[in-house]
Amino acid sequence: MRTLTLLTTLLLLALHTQAESPQGSTKEAPDEEQDISVFFGGDKGTALQDAAVKAGVTCSCRTSSCRFGERLSGACRLNGRIYRLCC
């Protein structure tokens, strides 16, 4: 259940980030993979944040398929391009 909640939150975060991206960006993202940090805001720690820290969850935006040990968790947008979010 916690995993489902974490994945849902990551997906919503990716969609929210995509909606806030400025339109018409002229910069192109490099074709290399880029790591991103996921932060769960708020003054107090949440159970979801605590679970993510304990589990050591690290997510990356990947141009190709997810690496061994990672799962496709949604999509992320960098500089106007959409990538795979692998955690």
Curated annotation (Swiss-Prot):
Propeptide residue range(s): 20-58
Database matches in InterPro entries: Alpha-defensin, Alpha-defensin_C, Alpha-defensin_N, Beta/alpha-defensin_C
Q: Which residues form the signal peptide?
A: 1-19
A single GO BP:
disruption of plasma membrane integrity in another organism
Stretches assigned to coiled coil: none
Tissue specificity annotation = Highest expression in bone marrow and to a much lesser extent in small intestine.
Q: Where, subcellularly, is it found?
A: Secreted
Q: Which SMART domains match?
A: Defensin_propep, DEFSN
What is the predominant subcellular site recorded for this chain?
secreted
SUPFAM superfamilies from the UniProt entry: Defensin-like
Record key words, sorted: Antibiotic, Antimicrobial, Defensin, Disulfide bond, Fungicide, Secreted, Signal
The organism sits in which domain of life?
Eukaryota
List all disulphide bridges recorded for this chain: C59-C87, C61-C76, C66-C86
Q: Name one GO cellular component term.
A: extracellular space
Pfam families per record = Defensin_1, Defensin_propep
According to its UniProt entry, the function of this protein is described as: Active in vitro against S.aureus, fungi, Gram-positive and Gram-negative bacteria and to a lesser extent against an enveloped virus.
- To which protein family does this belong? Belongs to the alpha-defensin family.
What name appears for this protein in its UniProt entry?
Answer: Neutrophil antibiotic peptide NP-3A
